[in-house]
Amino acid sequence: LVCFVVVVFMAAAAAMAGADRELKYLSHGGVDFPVPAGRLDGVVSR
């Protein structure tokens, strides 16, 4: 059972790494889009 969990975890990690590598390739090295800063609920911190 433990071996199965390790194999599934490694497969998931490999899939995520592949997706990340593909995104970097398709976006020519970087993804650039604006991200709003600050709190989304409108409250201003002191």
UniProtKB/Swiss-Prot annotation:
Q: Does the keyword Lipid biosynthesis apply?
A: no
Example GO CC term: the record gives: extracellular region
Broad class of enzyme this protein falls into: oxidoreductase
- GO molecular-function term, one example from the UniProt record: lactoperoxidase activity
In short, the EC number is 1.11.1.7
This protein's name: Peroxidase 1
Keyword terms of this UniProt record: Calcium, Heme, Iron, Metal-binding, Oxidoreductase, Peroxidase, Secreted
Subcellular localization: Secreted
**Assigned protein family:** Belongs to the peroxidase family. Classical plant (class III) peroxidase subfamily.
Cofactor dependence: heme b; Ca(2+)
Role noted for this protein:
Removal of H(2)O(2), oxidation of toxic reductants, biosynthesis and degradation of lignin, suberization, auxin catabolism, response to environmental stresses such as wounding, pathogen attack and oxidative stress. These functions might be dependent on each isozyme/isoform in each plant tissue.
Reactions it catalyzes? 2 a phenolic donor + H2O2 = 2 a phenolic radical donor + 2 H2O
Q: Does the keyword Zinc apply?
A: no
Cofactor, free-text remark: Binds 1 heme b (iron(II)-protoporphyrin IX) group per subunit.
User: What species is this protein from?
Assistant: Catharanthus roseus
